[in-house]
């Protein structure tokens, strides 16, 4: 077995983990994007640039523009235009592939599957590309993805409404806010026309022509074989921060702390073998 750590995800958490682990063991950092920083921070972010410099100084092998597909028998199947399709040997896999907002099913929204309901990442990229999702969109959630989508919608002169079950969240980026309300259902014929919300037995209907799902972050799971339930047996560690409000400094701190836990676990595995 090759004594090398494989890290999938070159966002802030992945970079922070790589910067720490590479001081102890040979490390390879893999990301499907051709640049560092992930989809939320970007390659120009100062924290990402600083962490990448530390990784380079420690001899981290960067495989950007490369997707990790399958983890099996301490080998990672990777694919990319430069690497092709091949297996990469590693003694341990660290998955730092980030998070995603909950789906309509995970939010337990009742109603038919209607057009005009978008995951936050899709809504953001469409809006940035010039697509107008609607005139009166509703954004479910109030974290960084909700803010990012709202600011993009504002450039298209959309009157965005933010709804969140957390009454303490700051939402100064929205035109209208419904804090402390729980979204429970979607209504419309073919396309979404209204969102139903509930609070303390009261039910309200919010008219809209688009809904963006940007709330309650959940961990990505994109590598076949890297399953959380079998992580102990498969030499896999997961480093994913579920906070909706954490900034880059918070995520870097989280990644460094997680690296210490990974090192402790690897030492335990080595001692057992």
Language model features: what each stretch is:
Residues 1-273:
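Residues forming the flavin
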């Amino acid at each position: 077995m090759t004594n090398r750590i494989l890290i999938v995800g070159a966002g802030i958490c992945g970079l922070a983990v790589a910067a720490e682990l590479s001081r102890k063991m040979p490390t390879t950092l893999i990301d499907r994007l051709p640049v560092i920083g992930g989809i939320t921070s970007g390659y120009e972010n100062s924290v990402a640039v600083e962490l990448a410099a530390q990784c380079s100084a420690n001899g981290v092998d960067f495989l950007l523009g490369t997707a990790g597909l399958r983890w099996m028998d301490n080998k990672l199947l990777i694919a990319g235009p430069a690497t092709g399709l091949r297996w990469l040997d590693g003694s341990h896999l660290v998955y730092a592939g980030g998070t995603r907002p909950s789906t309509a099913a995970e939010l337990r929204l009742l109603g038919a599957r209607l057009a005009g309901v978008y995951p936050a990442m899709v809504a953001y990229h469409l809006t940035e590309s010039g697509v107008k999702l609607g005139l009166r969109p509703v954004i479910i959630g109030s974290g960084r993805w909700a803010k990012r989508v709202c600011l993009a919608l504002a450039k298209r002169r959309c009157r965005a409404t933010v709804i969140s079950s957390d009454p303490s969240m700051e939402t100064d980026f929205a035109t209208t806010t419904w804090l402390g309300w729980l979204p429970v259902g979607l209504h419309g014929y073919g396309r979404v026309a209204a969102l139903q919300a509930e609070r303390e037995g009261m039910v309200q209907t919010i008219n809209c022509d688009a809904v963006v799902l940007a709330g309650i972050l959940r961990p990505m799971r994109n590598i076949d074989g890297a399953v959380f339930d079998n992580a102990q047996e498969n030499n896999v560690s997961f480093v994913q921060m579920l906070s909706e409000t954490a900034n880059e400094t918070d995520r870097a701190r989280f990644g460094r702390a997680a690296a210490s836990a990974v090192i402790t676990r690897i030492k335990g595995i080595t001692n057992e073998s």
